[in-house]
Amino acid sequence: MKGKYHFKVYNKKLLFEFDINRNITFIQGNSATGKTTLLNMMYDYLLSGRGSGITVETNAKFMVYLRKSLTATWKQELGNLTDTIIFIEENNRFIQRSDFTKFVKESGNYFVFINRKALKMLPYSVTEIYRLQNEYSEEEKKQVYTLQQRYPTLTYMNGNVNLIATEDSNSGLEFFSKVFNNIEITSTYGNTKVISFLENIENTDILCIVDGAAFGCFIKDLISTCNQHPTKHITYWAPESFEFLLLTAKTINFPELDKILKDTYNYVDCIKFVSWERFYTFLMETKSNGQAAYDKHSITQFYITEENINKVLKIFPKSIQLLAQAGKEYKTMNLF
């Protein structure tokens, strides 16, 4: 299953309108923010159609699983579904189990979790965690609910960074070491170890770089760690992935690259790629060749030439560019 899917769910008083872009989406928020109302409306529509007083307009097949059935297990109810967007509420404990995790990764369906807790065994994007926001629309004469991204991909930096910690221990680490040549750089050796690394390290003024496409399950913990250790001055940057940066910077080029980057959801088959991070790695490994052949385990000289480093720098956020520029100025000053 791949693609972007639009939903418009409404009755006489309420309207929910949103898009689902990836195979795993979270809608979070406190009680009484509309999450359960949305699920109940969609569930009632599935049971009774427009006779329920509810309309669902969408280009997707969908299923709503509210609670454990008295007569069937989740496997019996969901196991045979394909190419379907499955909405699941948070009271279902089975979503924490390894067999359900396997189902999410291999079934070829999309999943929308109405869930306040992270699912640590699933790789999902920082940008696909939402909260519902609402306002009254005079045009619609309804209370209108839309999705708002919950977490930023870049937090404010005061300009001082003494340590950069990246989850990558291979090509990404080597590349960033070349770019930020006046700042100490280290690896946390995977996204599962980012939090413990930050909690235990004594350094201050730390920039943490993570692959946002698969870091959603840890982002709340990362923000909590930043807040719990204010004297460490921890900030973070969560681009989709290192390979995404290389592709966006056009360090390599091939037909349809622009279309793929603009509408990635149309190209990522979730039964083949559980996250966009893996898809971008696949592109780099299969679309590069010769001197530009990409190796995730060790950066090749092609990608750390001045020309390609500058290409990548141009697509960095401004505050990250300034860090790298400070490194260049420092290096130049040391030559004289």
List PLM regions with ranges.
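Conserved glycine(s) of the Walker
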Residues: T33-K35
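Post-Walker A alpha-helix
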Residues: L38-N40
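Acidic, divalent-metal-binding catalytic cores of TOPRIM
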Residues: N92-R93, T127-F336
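Structural recognition of the conserved hydrophobic beta-strand(s) that form the central parallel beta-sheet
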Residues: F87-E89, G108-L119
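N-terminal pre-Walker A segment at the start of P-loop NTPase domains
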Residues: M1-F16, E138-K141
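Conserved P-loop NTPase "ATPase switch" module shared by AAA+ and STAND
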Residues: L66-S98
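Post-Walker A helix-loop "phosphate-sensing" segment adjacent to the P-loop in P-loop NTPases
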Residues: D44-T55
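Hydrophobic anchor at the beta1->P-loop junction of P-loop NTPases
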Residues: I27
